[in-house]
Amino acid sequence: MIKGYELNLNSKFFFKGNLKLKLTEKEIEIILYLNDKKIKHNVEKLQKNIWGYSADMETHTVETHVYRLRKKISDLFKDEQFILSHKNGYFID
């Protein structure tokens, strides 16, 4: 369970009640990484640990993926608080 949601790694479905959402591999990696650590992670940490990019690389990959994942979750589950951000860090509380 992740904040009241279930994640099936085999089917890649993220669900709560009767609602289910198909996730990509990267979306699953983001959720598992943010949930496992229980701390705020800045963009550089996510770039390095999920994408393997160096911290000094200029990219908006993390922000774009997190934005799209938040939107998918918000659109289906009406949950705008699943992935939180604070001072350039992302976390699941």
Go through the PLM ranges and name each one.
Residues N18-L23, E29-T64, I73-L76, K87:
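Positively charged, aromatic-enriched patches within helix-turn-helix-type DNA-binding elements
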Residues L69:
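Signature for phosphate-centric chemistry
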Residues M1, I73-L76, E80:
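Short, solvent-exposed secondary-structure boundary motifs
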Residues D79-D93:
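A short linear beta-strand->loop->alpha-helix hinge motif most characteristic
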Residues I2-I28, L32, F91-D93:
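A structural micro-motif at secondary-structure boundaries
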